[in-house]
Amino acid sequence: CNQSCLHCHVAAGPNRTEEMADEDIDLVIALLSAGGIETLDITGGAPELNAHFRRLVEAARGLGVKVMDRCNLTILEQPDQAGLAEFLAAHQVEIVASLPCYLSDNVDAQRGKGVFKDSIRGLQRLNALGYGDGRSGLVLNLVYNPQGAQLPPAQEPLEQAYKDRLRSDYG
């Protein structure tokens, strides 16, 4: 992962070197090829940093398997990930992106200085491609991450607050 979040459930981060090997990707593709699997849910951090991510997505979509990419939005702003947003859109990958809050101070306090700004740029890049517009079929879901040992608030008012604030502040 390109971030170091204290709450990370997979203990990912830029100093970690482990990644799923090419042989394991081949096994996943073989399993998908056998049939019966409708959705491939790829989780991160930033699973796009795996050297075999695009090959896995292409294979899954070629088999008619829905692909979900659970990621952070800042990965779209990494120089070595040029064309990633376009790749995801071209393959109709559903994006489940972590955005812990719609306020920059809260996000940067949880994830590091500048993370909010890069997240908004990534979100705008996805929106420009049709993600979240309700017409393109490109699905974008934002995930709220509570800070501390607490449950999140009810989804409907939280979703509306995100939409209202992000729309008014960033278009």
Segments predicted by a language model, with ranges:
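Short secondary-structure boundary micro-motifs
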Residues: N2, D24-I25, Q92, P100
